[in-house]
Swiss-Prot record:
This is Toxin Cm38. GO terms for molecular function: sodium channel inhibitor activity; toxin activity. May block sodium channels (Nav) found. Reversibly modifies the firing of DRG neurons by causing membrane depolarization and increasing the number of action potentials. Shows antimicrobial activity against the Gram-negative bacteria K.pneumoniae (MIC=64 uM), and only a very weak activity against S.aureus. Does not show hemolytic activity. Keywords: Antibiotic, Antimicrobial, Disulfide bond, Ion channel impairing toxin, Neurotoxin, Secreted, Toxin, Voltage-gated sodium channel impairing toxin. GO terms for biological process: defense response to bacterium. Its main location: secreted. Has the structural arrangement of an alpha-helix connected to antiparallel beta-sheets by disulfide bonds (CS-alpha/beta). InterPro entries: LCN-type_CS_alpha_beta_dom, Scorpion_toxinL/defensin.
């Protein structure tokens, strides 16, 4: 897994964990 960012439909960025 690695750290990453995803953006929701409102354009907000938040930390996530990408496997």
């Amino acid at each position: 897994a690695r750290d990453g960012y995803i953006v929701d439909e409102k354009g907000c960025k938040f930390a996530c964990f990408i496997n």
